[in-house]
From Swiss-Prot:
This is Elongation factor 2. Pathway: Protein biosynthesis; polypeptide chain elongation. The modification Diphthamide is found at H699. CDD domains: aeEF2_snRNP_like_IV (cd01681), eEF2_snRNP_like_C (cd04096), EF2 (cd01885), EF2_snRNP_III (cd16261), EF2_snRNP_like_II (cd03700). The modification N6,N6,N6-trimethyllysine is found at K509. Inhibited by fusidic acid and sordarin, which prevent the release of eEF2 from the ribosome after the translocation step. While fusidic acid acts on all eukaryotic eEF2, sordarin specifically binds and inhibits only selected fungal eEF2. Residues 17-346 form the tr-type G domain. It comes from Saccharomyces cerevisiae (strain ATCC 204508 / S288c) (Baker's yeast). It catalyses: GTP + H2O = GDP + phosphate + H(+).
Amino acid sequence: MVAFTVDQMRSLMDKVTNVRNMSVIAHVDHGKSTLTDSLVQRAGIISAAKAGEARFTDTRKDEQERGITIKSTAISLYSEMSDEDVKEIKQKTDGNSFLINLIDSPGHVDFSSEVTAALRVTDGALVVVDTIEGVCVQTETVLRQALGERIKPVVVINKVDRALLELQVSKEDLYQTFARTVESVNVIVSTYADEVLGDVQVYPARGTVAFGSGLHGWAFTIRQFATRYAKKFGVDKAKMMDRLWGDSFFNPKTKKWTNKDTDAEGKPLERAFNMFILDPIFRLFTAIMNFKKDEIPVLLEKLEIVLKGDEKDLEGKALLKVVMRKFLPAADALLEMIVLHLPSPVTAQAYRAEQLYEGPADDANCIAIKNCDPKADLMLYVSKMVPTSDKGRFYAFGRVFAGTVKSGQKVRIQGPNYVPGKKDDLFIKAIQRVVLMMGRFVEPIDDCPAGNIIGLVGIDQFLLKTGTLTTSETAHNMKVMKFSVSPVVQVAVEVKNANDLPKLVEGLKRLSKSDPCVLTYMSESGEHIVAGTGELHLEICLQDLEHDHAGVPLKISPPVVAYRETVESESSQTALSKSPNKHNRIYLKAEPIDEEVSLAIENGIINPRDDFKARARIMADDYGWDVTDARKIWCFGPDGNGPNLVIDQTKAVQYLHEIKDSVVAAFQWATKEGPIFGEEMRSVRVNILDVTLHADAIHRGGGQIIPTMRRATYAGFLLADPKIQEPVFLVEIQCPEQAVGGIYSVLNKKRGQVVSEEQRPGTPLFTVKAYLPVNESFGFTGELRQATGGQAFPQMVFDHWSTLGSDPLDPTSKAGEIVLAARKRHGMKEEVPGWQEYYDKL
């Protein structure tokens, strides 16, 4: 345990080469918070007795009750390395003390937006995988997010104690399980990794994989064992590391290494990993768990483990825990892996800068980020807001990428829509103070140089969720984060007592600040809507709203799903609309956009902010668009970045450029609220074929053009075989074989489609993957548990939009029922207007 003061930390912050910013990511319940504990205990915050139970990073009451992590929390740890270890570090270092900023993030699918916020400010990730369950859907989602942010992974295979005690596996089986898990991680890594990163696959023989048990507080890497044996046998450590993994076998008779699993006489040899690493661990486990009093002291002496006074009287699991912790302390293995293999900010920002910064790659600010320069202009990205103990105020939590942030410093606070040279979304204010985030506590400090993670007080009222702080007037923003989930489940919230309304409004503002992925808005009919990514996420948000942010009793409507409106074919005739003064006409047609193009727009591969020539090139080469069309994209909608497009296909129209702004504004409006039931449009492409305009500018202003364009868009849309799309979850369910039948019956009842079912080799568990419409997912978890006797655990994550085949204009069809219910709820006329209503005759 290190006694560790703020001053020591502050001095380490200046040696940026010795800082490591990393996050812990994993599937839900694979043991992130538990592993984090053994690290925190090493840095001197939890007592050793509590590690494994305290879950120090789960700061909220509901996190401790539910046993899940909901918000990501940050902690700074201090670690000292021996000189020979420091020599092995491939990057520049200075001295042997290291500062590790660790962020524990939630594993539950519904909170993956929290994970994104954590990943943005870190350079490395500790991926935790359960030995028995292996790589699950969420491990893959989060790992994909990390690699997309150019973050280097290292892996911990956790819960090895379960494999030994519950499943009683043999050594070779355990080795095969490990090897399979490492392989499935590497498959994901090689699929999604960025070339810039080089080879970021994980190799046990290089020490980038650790094995252990968070609950018992022990872990090891192959490097640690190689170091032990290298000293004992006087061999080279690097050679030893290679031999302790994979197909290498040691023949004790001839004292020779071979890569065949039999010796000359055909007797089977034992794999080196099993013989040198697993054997001592298995022996300890068997001796202690079978209460062999005489064998234990002999083993302990061989392994140089000394028990103190009252520890000698322990037996069974309690003794096992103490012994394993002394033999292989988890913190040593993990800290060594983090310090040796994860990049320092200096190394990482060199290759992450261009991806973090919106402006050109050669301007002063981008170069300062690349060099992680503490003397340059300040560049700080706020990735989220953390509620303080005093109600309604927030710390801004983020990372300094360049420059130094000081208490009392005046900074430019740039929101996500800021454009250099304009005044929108910009505040110039002073930071009241700079604090260090330590899990449940904060420590004030004076200033903080580039490369570190930090909390700021006093700027929360100027930022919604994220933003860039800078002192340079020419600086562009840091790029906005891409969330892999979208808010698709909504509820309407009302107050029970009308006097509390102002508190609700204030509470909704605070809620949308504190959670990066929640949407709050007011609908046409005056309801307050809260949208979240799934049932659990919404439940937590509403609980926060009721108890913390608003603090008043609320009435909550049953959840509703967000739909999208789309078209299936090209408009059957050209839609024409005249302006209110009859002097201007717009002719257009609507047609569908391919799903892959819509996805590319939603995932930011095709970006409205890109150079139009480069964008046209991509669309022509990868998606088969006509280059002239791709160059003439006027805008994306809704909100300027959605998957709907306006294409200018007119020939030689006078004054056309003058109405472009009005057309764009009208299109944003039309795509935000479609004609069928006021939901957003998706995958609709509008081709403007011809425009007739009045010669006098005064007769073709916004007031004439905007309503015309909107009517024309609606008419074209309704003529093009309109359909509605519903959101679909990908569900992954892990369960024992006898429960599979129960899962199928529940899925069939809820319009689910099973995609795959496979057994995990070496375990009795089955993994079922299925598509489940979000609309049907409410109460799914409960029904599933009932049908399978509590043996199945579903994980749901938004996967795609699926088009409903039936006709939304026919009130008797499935789609028509949904439309009718929504129109009633929104207070619109019950029948959908026909295209004639928006179409004008010549």
